[in-house]
């Protein structure tokens, strides 16, 4: 594996358990259901434009099923904004899930990457933000609409954009490695954050 680049990620849907003291540990899978499954939508139609979930449906699902809807609605709002900032256009209905345990909660983000870094991949987002599929065309008003779709206060959308821009830019140096790709991706994300700030100042 020395000559192969890879990313190792610890799974959040596995719990290490022991049947009895002294016995070997085993992994137990936590029950998870992606939003397509939860909404009864075929995985073949995971993109909104193909009949897949919309963000409005995703927020409604959390209001209905989450054990902590106020928290999870904001977490999903943050996830949408974060994906927008980094250029992850592939955040479709199968990339958001519910975890079922003692409580039903929005699962942590997974399958997250900056698809905007790859010119051959689609420029259209998997789900519309406030009626807009193309991330470069998203304006501040679209985040107002996004917050309203979430059932949150209208100003929260734009406020969280500002806050997450600051967070992303502040954390970026911590993520840089010697791998050349990380520098290129970081530059792209920084550019996207800068353009977003400029739009909000207009």
Give the role of each language-model region.
Residues 1-93, 97-202:
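Anionic ligand-binding catalytic core segments
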